[in-house]
Amino acid sequence: MKVYQTNEIKNIALLGNDGSGKTTLTEALLYESGVIKRRGRITAKNTVSDYFPVEQEYGYSVFSTVFHVEWNGKKLNIIDCPGSDDFVGAAMTALNVTDTAILLLNGQYGPEVGTQNHFRYTEKLGKPVIFLVNQLDNEKCDYDQVLEQLKSIYGSKVVPVQYPIATGPNFNSLIDVLLMKKYSWGPDGGEPKIEDIPAEEMEKAKEWNKNLIEAAAEHDEGLMEKFFEKDSLTEDEMREGIRKGLASRGMFPVFCVCAGKDMGVRRLMEFLGNVVPFVSEMPKVHNTRGEVVEPDSNGPTSLYFFKTAVEPHIGDVQYFKVMSGKVHEGDDLTNADRGSKERMAQLFVCAGANRIKVEELCAGDIGCTVKLKDVRTGNTLNGKGAENRFNFIKYPNSKYSRAIKPLNEADTEKLMAVLNRMREEDPTWVIEQSKELRQTIVHGQGEFHLRTLKWRLENNEKLQIKYEEPKIPYRETITKAARADYRHKKQSGGAGQFGEVHLIVEPYYEGMPMPDTYKFNGQEFKINVKGTEEVPLEWGGKLVFVNSIVGGSIDARFMPAILKGIMSRMEQGPLTGSYARDVRVIVYDGKMHPVDSNEISFMLAGRNAFSEAFKNAGPKILEPIYDVEVFVPSDKMGDVMGDLQGRRAMIMGMSSESGYEKLVAKVPLKEMSSYSTALSSLTGGRASFIMKFASYELVPSDVQEKLMKEFESKQDKDE
């Protein structure tokens, strides 16, 4: 295969909602470019994309597919991404290593929730966007309505380059207002018949052509002057204007295809090859030090590894982008993230599961390799003279979590190893072994995300597992001061155990003054601080431990044991066994025995005195609250708001964004357990949401009472 230079390479992400036809379009692109001899079908399970068994089982893309096409001396690297928001990590990864995004739309639905989500990602990254309306042969397709929806959402930057003469089952022709030609196809699609525009379409075509010329001229001062002079531009001038408009996101061209019948695909590739910006024309990339890294094939070599796929009989197939320089088989490189040395194995360019061996890849190109010993997704490999490190991708917070356990306890270690390996394939997985909750928790993007994980574990790894509701990481605290004392005494012949601790607890906040007197039941307790220790708690908040012992009632050597006992109780709070936080403890008195006192005695005395005082100090349970943003169609706003209010949500605000209503709320984590499934059901899959931790807040009194009863009941059963 030819070695393509940087100025011959274009990298494109193919995005779209589930059902928009990305896999079918991929087949048509590969067929038209000669990479495959026959187009596969999803129902036949023989497509280049969706070749993993789990994808064929469910009929949906789960992983991104990297492929390339060669067209008129250009190489187009295209990454076909899953449409479901459950697999958003693949789309975000693809956008970070490509330069242009194609947003594919199902002609019968127009912009959907996936379109909105993907557009937001392109917006954040400043990537050019082409809208591509597919399935024009569907009887419910209304191209004009789709175009109006796009303009309503994204404004005047939406500029059509093509329009169908008719849609529905009889679709077989379109007008291209850049070339001012009619394209038509026979029943099998493929190579079009290109003709002059018929008279009945000429008026509309001229109007749309003028709109396109004006839009193209806006992005180049020289073109604008020519347009004012001649009221027109040549085809090449229009292409140049569109290229600049695309690159600056000042223009979003709209194209038409019927991928299932291979109509319009060849013309799309012509546009991609002729107009879409090259790697070298896009904004410069920066490394983690903020330095510009030029896509220069003559510079030092740097590779960014953005994807790992585990394939049977092969192992890890690792995909990379050449950020600078060139790479060859046998090159010695250094892992900037792990410090290890790597020798590059064979190099390939990709077409799904099929790979073509190449000798060299230049800056800007995308390829894959196998048998690297210590490379992870997100790592950078550098050649001599390069000291780059790239950290492009910030994945979204998890939205759906379940505790996971093997049905056979003996498989626990194997399960953890497999989960960690799978995280290399999909970094949006978060695997948490919670000491606090005593559960292994898998955090993902949705119910379907976890369903595919279960299928893969059971079918690929032969691991039988079950999901459970994850426990909620509640916290416990107090709202007023209280005191208690406790004597630990044990005598069983010989040396015994004795320790007595008197202490005060009170709620603590940063910068809180230290009183010198406390009063309980009419009795005053004067405090003479001898020492203070602030303990930052790994679960949040603080414990402030104050030594106020006077007269030597407790030796200083026993104070660490008292603190240890208190800490052990804070790790298992008295109300529900949850972590306690934000407490100040003042040890002001106690007793020792000259023979029987020891560390264990004072640890137990401190633990029990703290527990008793805590229960008398207005104890409260805190629950995690999350900031939630829901993107919902206007006609479903009332239903979604009502559902959130039923989840104890506090509605913080509403606004319009990208054609959808945005609802902002604070919601207890307990109420978000199956929200992704509920929201999909409520809106017919037309809404999406994001969530992130906000704070801990007091639970309502009825919820606290219920939680305490559940804990007491469990304690009774355990005993």
Question: Where do the model's predicted regions map?
Answer:
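Structural and coupling elements of P-loop NTPases
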Residues: 1-719
